[in-house]
Amino acid sequence: MNNTIFDDVFRTMIEKMPYLAVPLINEVFHTSYPQDVPIVQLRNEHQQENGEIITDSCLKIGGKLYHIECQSVDDTTMAIRMIEYDFSIAVENAHKQGRRYRMDFPKSCVLYLRSGNNTPDFLEVEMVLPDENTVLYRIPAIKLEAYTKDSIFEKNLLMLLPFYIMRYEKDIHEMSENSELFQCLLNEYEEIRMNLVIELSGADKTALYMDLNKLIIKIADYICQSEEVVRKGIGEVMGGKVLELESERLRAEGEIRGEAKGEERLSILINRLILDGRSTEIQSVVTNAEIRKQMYKEYGI
């Protein structure tokens, strides 16, 4: 099983859209950071004598360290791996007070994309220190299956949307043969798309809408790769398949210049196309200036 795709998508969101992690941090650690809170991304590579370890994310917000790992399987060694990661992060950020060092462990959690009855709510390691004192290392385990599409939007946990299809992973084959179940799935994704349009309707959020859309399709393509009908259906509902982050490619090609007026105009056009069921035309609109000009005229924008 290719678990790299899940790591890649999660790290892409952390690196290119770190503000999406803020609502998740608020949910897990009961904080109340605003979504525009300053975020410092710390390096994910930590050098140890026996080699390098790589974490999924390490963020500094409000003077505190946060570490989130995305896990696609219920690995029983995860508690030990997490304390190893967190110890490395704490050592790298240790500060000296006279002859004494202080190490602050990050606030950490594991996001389980797949979980079962035996997946714990907390990962724990009991540490016996040299003076025989015992310290309990305990971090929360967050399970994707606990979040419906409604709770995701209610809590603004948009970071979970690309992985939403994994809630139905075991039912994909049955859906491909049962038109009623298949239509229920498509209806869910239609609601997801429309909610995204509402949540990300501002001119400054057009790029985020496109990026999330493509990541949703990327994971759905992978999960449904053996069921062409389901894979294609989700892709059509979400508006087409482009694996490269669309907004980044557009910026590289110079199609989006960043002028506020131009971005707002394009955002309005994209939203109109989505509402009219013309999502398949979005890519040509954002990549072809002539087609975009014609569409502006057609919609009177």
What do the PLM-derived regions correspond to, one by one?
Residues 1-159, 289-301:
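Accessory alpha/beta interaction modules
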